[in-house]
Design a protein with these regions (language model features):
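N-terminal small/polar loop signature for handling phosphorylated ligands or for N-terminal nucleophile
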Residues: 42, 46, 50, 56-122, ...
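An N-terminal, well-structured beta->alpha segment
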Residues: 1-74, 80, 159-189
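Short, compositionally biased "basic patch" segments
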Residues: 1-22, 132-152, 259-261
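Gly/Ser/Thr-enriched, mixed-charge loops and adjacent short helices
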Residues: 121-249
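Conserved protein kinase catalytic core
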Residues: 18, 202, 267-269
Length: 290
C-alpha cells in the first residue's frame, strides 16, 4: 500500500521516480500518480460542487526521464474518475496554470509533472485550479483522500484529448510582448537573445516566442529536452548554470541571455556584459521597470 503522506513536499508532491542512485528507493510510481490523480479529481469536484465527470483537467510534464510514465499514470487516474483529460505533453508550469484561465481553454484544473530543479531521478506533481496553485493543507487533504480510495478500473480513453496548449500559450506570450513594446509583429528584430533551457521544457521560449518576434536566437544552448541534464544542473541559481548562459552571451555577442529551470518557473538573466540578474537582483530589476 502506498504511503501517500510521505510524498508531500509543502504545496507539491515529490518523490524518487527512477532507480539508479544509491540509497534512494523509488517512492513516486505511475501507480501512486494514478491514485493521487483520482484523489485530485474527487477533491476538485467536491470544491466545485459538481461530479468528476463534469471536470476537464490538463496534464503536462517537463523533460524528466520518468515524465511520460508518471504523466500517463496521472491521466489514467483522472479518466478512471470520469474526468476529461487534456494531454499537454511537454509543457511549462506557468502554461499549466494558464490552461485554467486562457481563452479557449479555461479548464477546471491542471497537473504539472515536474520536480523543478531537483536531480534527474526525482519527479513530482504540481496542482492548479483557476484560483492558483494548491496549498499545503490542500495537498494533505488530497493525499488523505488518495489513501482511502477503493480500487478502480480503467476509464474511458475517449475522454482524453490532445490539447495543443503550448502553441496557444506561446501565442499569448507573443501578444503580451508585442503589446508591451508596441512595435508591430516583430518587435525583437535586430536583437540577439541567447536562451539556456538546461535541456528542460523551456526551449519553446526561444523557438516559439522570441524567434517569431524577430529575435536572433542562434547563440542559444541546451534547447533540446534531455532528462539526463547533460549540460549542467537545471537551476538558474546554480553557479555552473549561470556560467553557461554568461558564456553563451559573451561568446555570441548577445544583447541578453535568459536561463530557465526544467519546468520554466524559475529564470535568470544576463546582460550583454555578462552581468547576472537572478533571485533578488532580478526582482529588483523588474520592480524598477514597473
Amino acid at each position: 500500500m502506498t504511503d501517500y503522506a510521505r510524498l508531500q513536499n509543502g504545496s507539491d508532491v515529490r518523490g524518487v521516480a527512477l532507480p539508479g542512485v544509491a540509497g534512494e528507493a523509488v517512492t513516486l510510481t505511475p501507480e501512486a500518480a494514478f491514485g493521487i490523480a483520482r484523489a485530485f479529481a474527487r477533491w476538485l469536484a467536491a470544491k466545485k460542487g459538481v461530479s468528476p465527470q463534469a471536470l476537464t483537467v490538463g496534464v503536462g510534464r517537463d523533460s524528466r526521464l520518468s515524465g511520460p510514465a508518471i504523466a500517463a499514470g496521472v491521466m489514467e487516474g483522472l479518466l478512471a474518475e470520469g474526468a476529461r483529460c487534456g494531454d499537454c505533453a511537454m509543457a511549462s508550469t506557468p502554461a499549466m496554470f494558464m490552461s485554467t484561465v486562457l481563452p479557449g481553454f479555461g479548464w477546471d484544473g491542471a497537473v504539472m509533472v515536474t520536480a523543478s530543479h531537483l536531480p534527474w531521478n526525482r519527479n513530482g506533481l504540481k496542482f492548479f485550479t483557476r484560483q492558483g496553485g494548491l496549498e499545503n493543507a490542500d495537498i494533505r487533504e488530497l493525499l488523505a483522500i488518495a489513501g482511502e480510495l477503493p480500487a478502480a478500473g480503467a476509464g474511458d480513453t475517449d475522454r482524453r484529448f490532445e490539447a495543443g496548449l503550448m502553441e496557444a500559450y506561446s501565442a499569448h506570450l507573443r501578444g503580451i510582448i508585442c503589446q508591451g513594446i508596441g512595435a508591430g509583429e516583430q518587435p525583437l528584430a535586430g536583437i540577439k537573445i541567447a536562451v539556456d533551457a538546461g535541456n528542460g521544457a523551456g526551449g519553446f521560449f526561444a523557438r516559439q516566442v522570441l524567434q517569431p518576434l524577430g529575435a536572433d536566437i542562434s547563440a542559444s544552448v541546451l534547447l533540446e529536452p534531455d532528462g539526463h541534464f547533460p549540460g549542467h544542473i537545471p537551476n538558474p541559481e546554480d553557479k555552473a548554470a549561470m556560467a553557461s548562459i554568461r558564456q553563451a552571451v559573451i561568446e555570441g555577442g548577445c544583447d541578453l541571455g535568459l536561463i530557465f529551470d526544467t519546468d520554466v518557473d524559475r529564470a535568470g538573466a544576463v546582460d550583454r556584459n555578462g552581468q547576472e540578474f537572478c533571485r533578488n537582483r532580478l526582482i529588483a530589476l523588474m520592480s524598477a521597470i514597473v
